[in-house]
C-alpha cells in the first residue's frame, strides 16, 4: 500500500515497547501500540515520541513496518511515575521539536495521548503549524470523584 501520510504520535509515558503490567504500563500502552500499527497497516507512517525511561534502547526503534518509537531525553533516563512527569514536559516538548527538525520529517498530523502529551501537542502545533487530535484516556475530575484520596493525579 502506498504511503498515505505521516503521523507524529506523542505519548510521553505510554511507550508501546513497555513491559505490560509494570508500573504505569497497561491499557494506554496497548492503545498506542494498536493505533500506531493499525495506521501503518492502512499505509500511514507513524513515529511514536515517548520519554526515554531507560539508557538501554537506541533513540529510534522500529516497532513494526511503518512504525518507529522515538525515545526523547527529558529528565533522567529512568522510570518516573507519570504523576511526577510534568516538570519534564518542557524538555520533552523541546526534544520532540528538535528531533523533528533534525530529521527533516514532515508530519501531516499530531496525535497526542494523555493530558501531558496534549500540552506538548499544543506547543508543537504553535511552533510547527500542524493540526492535532487528542485522546485524554482519563479525566482527572472523574478520577478524583471515584478514587478520592487514593488518586495521585496532580491537583488542578
Region locations from a protein language model:
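Catalytic cores of nucleotide-sugar-dependent glycosyltransferases that transfer UDP/GDP/TDP-activated
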Residues: 1-156
Amino acid at each position: 500500500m502506498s504511503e498515505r501520510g505521516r503521523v507524529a504520535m506523542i505519548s510521553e509515558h505510554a511507550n508501546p515497547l513497555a513491559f505490560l503490567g509494570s508500573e504505569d504500563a497497561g491499557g494506554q500502552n496497548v492503545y498506542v501500540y494498536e493505533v500506531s500499527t493499525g495506521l501503518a497497516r492502512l499505509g500511514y507512517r507513524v513515529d511514536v515520541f515517548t520519554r526515554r525511561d531507560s539508557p538501554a534502547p537506541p533513540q529510534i526503534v522500529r516497532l513494526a513496518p511503518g512504525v518507529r518509537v522515538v525515545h526523547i531525553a527529558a529528565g533522567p533516563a529512568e522510570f518516573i511515575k507519570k504523576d511526577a512527569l510534568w516538570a519534564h514536559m518542557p524538555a520533552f516538548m523541546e526534544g520532540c521539536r528538535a528531533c523533528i527538525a533534525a530529521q527533516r520529517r514532515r508530519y501531516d498530523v499530531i496525535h497526542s495521548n494523555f493530558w501531558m502529551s496534549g500540552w506538548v501537542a499544543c506547543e508543537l502545533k504553535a511552533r510547527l503549524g500542524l493540526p492535532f487530535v487528542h485522546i485524554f484516556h482519563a479525566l482527572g475530575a472523574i478520577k478524583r470523584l471515584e478514587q478520592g484520596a487514593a488518586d495521585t493525579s496532580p491537583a488542578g
